[in-house]
Curated annotation (Swiss-Prot):
InterPro entries: Formate_THF_ligase, Formate_THF_ligase_CS, P-loop_NTPase. Pfam families: FTHFS (PF01268). HAMAP family: FTHFS. It comes from Shewanella baltica (strain OS223). This is Formate--tetrahydrofolate ligase. GO terms for biological process: tetrahydrofolate interconversion. The gene is fhs. ATP binds at T65, P66, H67, G68, E69, G70, K71, T72.
Length: 580
């Protein structure tokens, strides 16, 4: 089979204006970027304000493994197949960060014959939204550092006299707004700024990857430009010496930050291999952020299509949970059905029997993940069953989609389908979207349509009015199956402080490992009798949630021993090669 890159480069594409017209966009509602992509103007929402909305489908997965489960492949393949059976469908997915593209994970355009094309344009830069987020974020960091410098240099009276601005009395050790870059760069996790003469008071700081920026979350959760402007104004950049918050509005930088992102709020329209529309917008990670594409993209697509297929990052304990408890809480748009993606490989890897973790230990034999192994499959089914029940907990009909690999055993696939059909799932189908494109997920598409016709009884996991401690306990015990939650001394103090400042009503965004339902990546399958350790609570007042840092999760990844950039180059024709 051809590589993803080869398939993408050989694709016959619709002109982007034709694609937009087929979706229902007017020419003036598209800002063209060449022939293959266009920004969608938000004026379309005003034109279609009274339009009946389509049905939203959320795609999630079992606990992820290094083998890849094919969640984006399924999202794109399902969209293609829905259009093939006569439904009008549109996909809504996140913009890939270049950190994973050049790291281990690679691109995020799907794969095989179920991908967004041209995939190299999607995976590298696209229309510049992530750069806009980085620039706006770093403007805020530069502004707070400059204000600190001038206030320290002049003192209150002289500063106010010369600048005409209020003295903010910034506490250097309470600056909460650091810097971001769209790369994996571990050496930037801890830095000191202000070093040297006349460069400002020294203070400790850091870099996060741009996908972890609160501005990225704001981009994903805003309803329109005015809402984004208001949210940016609420950003808490620092505390003063009395412990009071200093916002971007207080600093006078919110307007300029918004101006940088004025075009970034518009989703980007691209197409799949069979010419199905796909809106790409925002890129928050699901382990260290809320992990879903934008409310605006969903809203536009739902007014133009019968079915909108979106996805949450990683497993149902991660992006799906945050889709429900953060995104739906703010959008008011509940899903009609969910698709839970799994593979035979994923279940064997999640079995807890000679897993990849064990392979790091000497003298332990790890079976071939592609070989039939009924014992590992049955043990790993517990993980799938947990995720089925987790999705069903939210009152959503769940369809299991099994991504077929060429090495899969027919007998094992049959056993898995029978096991799923005896579970709480609405249905189960095998998908060959990777190898067959739109023809490979027809059965999945038909079952999803039937599931979406049932009456969804969507419900949130916890109410707004619950205390922060109660929300943490619910997420740990109900959301992950933990026996409890433990807060560090710092986290307890932060919970009290955030409640006192009036932020206790906000939902929680759990930042934890995606490689286990628990906080510990070595605990496979369905962990039991564990306590979730919360080390820190971080306020994101603009985005409208509080992040709980769990275990050893980091907001700046690092490059591995064999990073993806080693394979990427330009050939003699000037074409990008090695991207996948």
């Amino acid at each position: 089979m051809l590589t993803d890159m080869d398939i993408s480069s050989r694709a016959s594409l619709k002109n982007i204006t034709e694609l937009g017209a087929d979706l229902g966009l007017l020419p003036e509602e598209m800002m063209l970027f060449g022939h293959t992509k266009a920004k969608v103007e938000l004026s379309v929402l005003q034109r279609l304000a009274g339009q009946r909305k389509g049905k939203l489908i959320i795609v999630t997965a079992v606990t992820p493994t290094p083998h890849g489960e094919g969640k984006t492949v399924t999202s794109i393949g399902l969209t293609q197949s829905l259009n093939a059976i006569g439904q009008k469908a549109c996909a809504c997915i996140r913009q890939p960060s270049m950190g994973p593209v050049f790291g281990v994970k690679g691109g995020a355009a799907g794969g095989g014959y179920a991908q967004v094309v041209p995939m190299q344009e999607m995976n590298l830069h696209l229309t510049g939204d992530i750069h806009a987020v980085s620039s706006a974020h770093n403007l805020g960091a530069a502004a707070i550092a400059a204000r600190l410098f001038h206030e320290a240099r002049l003192g209150k009276t002289e500063f106010e006299a010369q600048s005409g601005q209020a003295f903010l009395d910034i506490a250097p050790n309470e600056i909460r707004w650091h810097r971001v870059v769209d790369h994996n760069d571990r050496c930037l996790r801890q830095i000191h700024v202000g070093l040297g003469d006349n460069n400002g008071p020294e203070y400790g700081s850091s870099f996060d990857i741009t996908a972890a920026s609160e501005l990225m979350a704001i981009l994903a959760l805003s309803h329109d430009l005015a809402d984004m402007r208001a949210r940016i104004g609420r950003l808490v950049l620092a505390l003063n010496t009395q412990g009071q918050v200093i916002t971007a509005e207080d600093l006078g930088v919110a307007g300029a930050m918004t101006a940088i992102m004025a075009d970034a709020i518009k989703p980007t329209l691209m197409q799949t291999l069979n010419g199905s529309p796909c809106l790409i917008h925002s890129g928050p990670f699901a382990n260290i952020a809320h992990g879903n594409s934008s409310i605006i993209a969903d809203d536009i697509a739902l007014r133009l299509a019968d079915f909108v297929v979106t996805e949450g990052g990683f497993g149902s304990d991660m992006g799906f949970e945050k889709f429900c408890n953060i995104k739906v809480r703010q959008s008011g748009q509940a899903p009609a059905a969910a698709v839970l993606v799994t593979t035979l490989k994923a279940l064997k890897a999640n079995s807890g029997l000679a897993t990849e973790v064990d392979s790091n230990a000497p003298n332990i034999h790890v079976p071939n993940i592609n070989a039939p192994d009924q014992a590992r499959l049955e043990a790993g089914f517990a993980n799938l069953n947990w995720h089925i029940n987790n999705v069903a907990r939210y009152g959503i009909p769940v369809v299991v989609g099994i991504n077929r690999f060429a090495t899969d055993s027919d007998a094992e696939l049959q056993w898995l389908m029978e096991a799923v059909n005896a579970s709480a799932a609405f249905g189960c189908e095998i998908s060959d979207a990777f190898s067959q494109g739109e023809a490979g997920a027809i059965a999945l598409a038909r079952t999803v349509v039937r599931a979406a016709e049932t009456e969804s009884q969507f419900k949130l996991l916890y109410p707004d009015e619950a205390s922060l401690e109660a929300k943490l306990s619910t997420l740990a015990e109900v959301g992950y199956g933990a026996s409890g939650v433990s807060l560090s001394i710092e986290a307890k103090q932060q919970a009290q402080q955030l409640t006192a400042l009036g932020y206790g009503h906000l939902p929680l965004c759990m930042a934890k490992t995606p490689l286990s339902i628990s906080h510990d990546p070595s605990l496979k399958g369905v962990p039991k009798d564990f306590v979730v350790p919360v080390r820190e609570l971080v306020l994101h007042a603009g985005a409208g949630f509080i992040t709980a840092l769990v275990g050893n999760v980091m907001t700046m990844p690092g490059l591995g021993l064999k990073p993806g950039y080693l394979k990427i180059d330009i050939d003699a024709k000037g074409e990008i090669v090695g991207l996948g």
